[in-house]
């Protein structure tokens, strides 16, 4: 499994059950290798302690190219503080 995590602050904690910080994960689970649709997919997800989550999938090229592009152009550019509005404006959707 490929995976990296970081913690970000949220400016609208009321949407995240009062949490002022949430986890952001970028990953590609091994079981996705078994299907043609997801074998090269990389997912970035903002996660709460409950089932609240906002995500974005990227599946344009091969796995290594997708991973490197997502890390450089999406994951590394997530600001230290985000809002749900920012997530939606940047292509993330409710899970």
Label each residue range with its predicted role.
Residues 1-11:
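Short, hydrophobic/aromatic-rich segments at coil-to-beta transitions
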């Amino acid at each position: 499994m490929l995976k990296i995590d970081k913690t970000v602050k949220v400016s609208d904690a009321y949407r995240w059950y009062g949490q002022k910080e949430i986890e952001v994960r970028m990953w590609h689970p091994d079981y996705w290798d078994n299907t043609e649709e997801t074998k090269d997919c990389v997912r970035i997800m903002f996660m709460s302690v409950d089932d609240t989550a906002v995500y974005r999938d990227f599946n344009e090229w091969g796995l290594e190219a997708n991973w490197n592009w997502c890390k450089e152009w999406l994951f590394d550019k997530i600001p230290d503080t985000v809002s749900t509005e920012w997530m939606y404006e940047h292509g993330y959707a409710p899970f």
